Amino acid sequence: MVTTRQIKAARALLGWSQADLAKRSGVSEPTVARLESIEGELGGRELTAEKIRAAIEGAGVLFIDENGGGSGVRLRKRSKQRSRK
């Protein structure tokens, strides 16, 4: 389950506006704004929620499930490339 707070936090980590998320997910900006205005689980149509989540995950954000410590987001650790000599 992804919450609207996680979506907002993910946008903040990425430095994205609602317009940026809309463009990258293929969802209209008014839809992003409407979905973010409702507290709780990300609602709307299932396909819309999947597009939003996929855009954010594709940009390197991991969603952290509620596990007693609270749900959240974090940036994926980038793999280090070793230089070859």
Feature map (PLM): residue ranges:
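A short, Lys/Arg-rich alpha-helix, primarily the initiator
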Residues: M1-A12, E50-R53
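Short alpha-helical DNA-recognition segment
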Residues: S17-R34
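DNA major-groove recognition helix of helix-turn-helix/homeodomain DNA-binding modules
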Residues: S25, E39, E46-F63
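Residue-level recognition of specific faces of alpha-helices
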Residues: Q6, T31-R34, A55, G72
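Short, charged recognition helix plus adjacent turn
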Residues: A54, G58-K85
